[in-house]
Amino acid sequence: MIITPYLNRKITRPLKWILALIFLYLIYICLFSNNSKPPKPRKKPKLVENYTCPFARTEGTASENLFFHTNNGTDARILVILDSLFSRHGKTIIQILNSQKLQFKAEAVSKNLPVLTTSRRGRYSLIIIENYYKYLNMAQWNRQLLDKYCKEYRVPMFSFMSSKPNDQLKRIKIKGSSLWMWQNQRIQRLAVTPSIIHRISKIGNYRQFSSSDPADWILFETSEKFESVLSGTVKSGYERAVVVRDKGLEDGVERIIFGRNLTDFQVKITFLDALWWAMGNQKSFTLDRFVQVDIDDVFVGAQGTRIVEEDVRKLISTQKEFRNYVQNFTFMLGFSGSYFRNGDDLEDRGDEFLVENAEKFVWFPHMWRHNHAHEHNFTYLEAIMAQNKLFAQNMHLPVDYPYAIAPQHDGVFPVHEQLFRAWRKVWNVSVTATEEYPHFKPATARKGFIHAGIHVLPRQTCGLYTHTQLFDEYPEGFDKVQKSIEGGDLFFTILLNPISIFMTHQQNYAYDRLALYTFENLFRFIKCWTNIKLKWQDPLTSSQLYFQKFPDERTPLWTNPCTDPRHHAILPPSINCTKKSLPDLLIIGPQKTGSTALASFLSLHPNTSQNTPVPGSFEEVQFFGGQNYLKGVEWYMSNFPSSSTVTFEKSATYFDNPSAPKQAASLVPHAKIVIILQNPAQRAYSWFQHILAHEDPVAITAGSLEVILDSNSTSSKKVRQRCISGGRYVHHLTKWLEHFSLQQMIFVDSDELKMKPPTVLNSLSKWLDLPEFPFETYIRYSPSKGFHCRLLDGKTKCLGESKGRKYPEMPENLRRKLDKIFSLDNSALYKFLRKNRLKIPTWLEESVRIRA
């Protein structure tokens, strides 16, 4: 049966009319309504006069064969003696040394000089003293020692002098020298004078000073013994040295003395030149500087702030002009395809015109919708990258190089592993860049690293951000940018970095086009004042060059992401900063000294917790300096699930690993360090027995440690090194003390640990500020094992069979041979402990007494 509902014609007729009217309205909207976005009225870009070089000659004046200073057997390291570790000028010196990747040791001036030599060579190739007055008034013994070192090892000295405002004396003879100085001087001209020091500076260049500039310069009188490097001319017309080179003809010590601090850009360039004269060589020094300018988010921006067609035309023409300053210069354009044609009519046309001229630029991908990597997993990241790649293919964008940039550098550092995986899979990325490694500030300390096959280069800012579009609205005035260009931070960014990758945004190329002004004037100023050769090369070539120059940076240096607010903001959810997940204490060995027993006993304390056992590495984490380090911070944190008062790990491989101190200090700088001191002869013998039990083929073939010590074969030398290395205490301690203070360390006597473990544990727990705990109740000697074990629930729990292994006593002739090998090391350890008023183990007392 069919049921037909009752229809009232009075109801259906009006409904039909309403539907018809709606249909007609929709047709009208489609045909006649103007659906375009009205463009925001654009003013013409403000014209600002470009920098003009005051010299007709702009070609370089550097010598083809530069002279470099040579030392007599010294390490490539600098000793910096500062007025204070917190002085502003001292920090500037340190930042320059960091930027040049130079190894240095910085100390505040004190009564005692640091040790200047090892048993075989000098520790430093250059001495920098921030305050020359402090050097002149140094205790006679210290100054004689310093001068003797500089003379014997041909080590130059740099130092700075400043005027004393209230001193009435103008002309003063420098103490112990024939050099005369003038203080509180006002100069009219500062000029670069001929000298073997200059590399970057253009000889003959000068700049004028006004009569209102302060009279606070120090000038030096020159002679055959003292050469001017940078000169200042006073009102009377006399030309004297602002920077003087003492040739060492009086006392055998070469010095470069600066009469001005590094706030003046010409003085700063001279300091940089002097550094390369003292520390460089023909192979390491170059005047080439590679510059890459990235335009990030070329389609991203609020309506009314984006580039239009005229801006694109100007971008193309300016790129050609820039090639007069920078060889092969090409802009790099980063894209998030979802935002294409997302502006008003003029801006949409700008996007279209940019794509029409895509072949004129180099393109690289961001994310499809400017996504933040740390918020997404691998599957999602892969999908949005694939969308962006499809967009690039459809628009015929030439993505010619395996280079990508993550929006806001999110996921690069701290590393988001899933971003790296997705990059490799979708784009086959092998190069990226970030401003966040190891930290955003200071910029001079930024570095590169390689992770998961991707080369990460340091990235630089230029003072331009998405909101900086107009000269008149620049925060703090556009004078700030001009100062940065003309001898300021931006200028020195290029001078200090062999490769500079600058981050800009498309908004910086709209309206007043601040980016074009900034870089044109930067290039002009560099060409005017320096011999630097500016070049562009693709990012893949740059990455290869960077890590060829700085191979030590290949392995990343992990930091605690929870202590840097910028890093904390871009952490993946898997890292929880509210939970303590890094150790407070490291038991670093060395191996075969009882470190496993110490860790086992310390874990008895209810307020301590040890890392979870790690398979394949004798339950040790073996993170710092080992293969596990490449697994990253998140993996390391995952080994410390507890949040006890004191969390610790024991990895006996750390002590003599050359990379461990620096890596540990970077991640856990406030950790306390436990070092166990055992007679190195006994330790070497124990280690040999250990590898013999583990069937090391070289040890088995040799049969005894004595044979290993006498053999000259390569394989035997490696085993010998493994046996001997851990017992060279002061040699390795020196490296740990470069990164940790002595107050962070405690030394445990291995013999005392073996005989009286509760005493050692009580002392250790007190040092760690732990509540008292009756260790003697939970530690018992096991006659069958021959060592102490833990007592839990009335039962002894001893270490495994590999611990406390019984083996024949060491032959007396072998002991004598090992004692001789370690005699100098033992003597150094004795002096170190005595100097620092630390307890000296009985075995060490006897060793030194027998040797005496």
UniProtKB/Swiss-Prot annotation:
The active site is at residue 592. Residues 575-852 are annotated as: Heparan sulfate N-sulfotransferase 1. It is found in: Golgi apparatus membrane. Its EC number is 2.8.2.8, 3.-.-.-, 2.8.2.-. SUPFAM superfamilies: P-loop containing nucleoside triphosphate hydrolases (SSF52540). Glycans are attached at residues 50, 72, 261, 328, 377, 428, 576, 607, 712. Coiled coil: none annotated. GO terms for molecular function: deacetylase activity; heparan sulfate N-sulfotransferase activity; hydrolase activity. Keywords: Disulfide bond, Glycoprotein, Golgi apparatus, Hydrolase, Membrane, Multifunctional enzyme, Signal-anchor, Transferase, Transmembrane, Transmembrane helix. Gene3D superfamilies: P-loop containing nucleotide triphosphate hydrolases. 3'-phosphoadenylyl sulfate binds at residues 592-596, 686, 803-807. Pfam families: HSNSD-CE (PF12062), HSNSD_N (PF25119), Sulfotransfer_1 (PF00685). Residues 35-852 are lumenal. Present in some specific neurons in head and tail regions and muscles. Pathway: Glycan metabolism; heparan sulfate biosynthesis; Glycan metabolism; heparin biosynthesis. GO terms for biological process: heparan sulfate proteoglycan biosynthetic process; heparin proteoglycan biosynthetic process. One of its GO terms (cellular component) is Golgi membrane. Disulfide bonds join 789-798. It is a single-pass type II membrane protein. It catalyses: alpha-D-glucosaminyl-[heparan sulfate](n) + 3'-phosphoadenylyl sulfate = N-sulfo-alpha-D-glucosaminyl-[heparan sulfate](n) + adenosine 3',5'-bisphosphate + 2 H(+). Essential bifunctional enzyme that catalyzes both the N-deacetylation and the N-sulfation of glucosamine (GlcNAc) of the glycosaminoglycan in heparan sulfate. Modifies the GlcNAc-GlcA disaccharide repeating sugar backbone to make N-sulfated heparosan, a prerequisite substrate for later modifications in heparin biosynthesis. Monomer. This is Bifunctional heparan sulfate N-deacetylase/N-sulfotransferase 1. It comes from Caenorhabditis elegans.
